[in-house]
């Protein structure tokens, strides 16, 4: 299903009450909402990723008391994002604790396309995806999940500029800030990662926890312009962005075609 806004309808929101024992002085009101076995969350990082794709969800997951959030890559050397931000992994892929509850892939540009043909990473994701409770992505990270064969027959979204590549990877393209199909949860471009993070916190810890977190983050977006989607943007701005993204669309499409041919050879 596509999701936007609150996970609760109006009637359910009226019934939302603080958990037993909660007071302003007793922040243990959220503490006792922790599961008996804290979640293991694996967030892939890689050279050329978009930092905000990662940071929005990581901020939300990091506020889940007791959860273990692992930033994973092939080794423990810092990786540089597409804007030059360096992020240090906390675990190598080979050392990831098993099993994980959630596997996550952020998007990017050239770095994402490179990952779509990286056998080591794709094999790792395919293996973890078999047992993870949730298989997830933000932005063009869904193309990496698709290249790993994890979106075959699933509805999924991506950044609007590359969403049309998904069918090549046998996924069913869908629009929406967050799209859920069984245990696959994908989000749209970049800033959708914050919505995605809150959505996953609600699924893992409940709506009360997620709404408290939303307030703590003061997440109440009021963008200065209404050009955040192709439908809302002025035609000339949309055309400009489309031209700017054309090389990425082409390279991602070629990478997806190559991956599909690889599947055919081994089927």
Predicted regions and their residues:
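Flexible glycine/proline-enriched surface loops and loop-helix/loop-strand junctions
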Residues: 108, 179-183, 194
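Residues at secondary-structure transition points
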Residues: 115-119, 157, 188
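Structural detector of well-ordered beta-strand residues that form the stable sheet scaffold
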Residues: 135-136, 157, 174, 185
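Active-site-proximal catalytic alpha-helix in oxidoreductases
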Residues: 142, 185-202
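A conserved active-site-flanking secondary-structure segment within enzyme catalytic domains
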Residues: 151-178
């Amino acid at each position: 299903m596509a999701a936007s806004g609150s996970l609760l309808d109006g009637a359910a929101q009226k019934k939302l009450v603080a958990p037993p024992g909660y007071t302003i002085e007793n922040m243990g009101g959220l503490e006792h909402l922790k599961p008996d076995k804290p979640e293991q969350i694996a967030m892939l990082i890689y050279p050329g990723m978009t930092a905000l794709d990662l940071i929005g969800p990581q901020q939300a997951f990091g506020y889940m008391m007791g959860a273990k959030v692992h930033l994973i890559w092939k080794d423990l050397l810092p990786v540089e994002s597409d804007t030059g931000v360096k992020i240090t992994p906390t675990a190598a892929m080979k050392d990831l604790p098993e099993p994980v509850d959630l596997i996550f892939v952020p998007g990017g540009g050239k770095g994402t396309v490179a990952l779509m043909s990286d056998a080591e990473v794709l094999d790792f994701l395919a293996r973890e995806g078999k047992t993870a409770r949730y298989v997830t992505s933000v932005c063009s990270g869904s193309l990496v999940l698709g290249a790993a064969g994890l979106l075959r027959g699933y509805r999924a979204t991506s950044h609007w500029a590359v969403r049309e590549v998904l069918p090549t990877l046998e996924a069913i393209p869908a629009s929406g800030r967050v799209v859920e199909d069984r245990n696959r949860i994908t989000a749209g471009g970049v800033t959708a990662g914050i919505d995605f993070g809150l959505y996953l916190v609600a699924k893992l810890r409940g709506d009360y926890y997620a709404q408290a977190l939303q307030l703590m983050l003061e997440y109440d977006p009021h963008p200065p312009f209404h050009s955040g989607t192709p439908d809302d943007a002025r035609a000339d701005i949309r055309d400009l962005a489309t031209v700017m993204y054309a090389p990425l669309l082409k390279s991602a499409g070629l990478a997806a075609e190559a991956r599909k041919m690889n599947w055919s050879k081994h089927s």
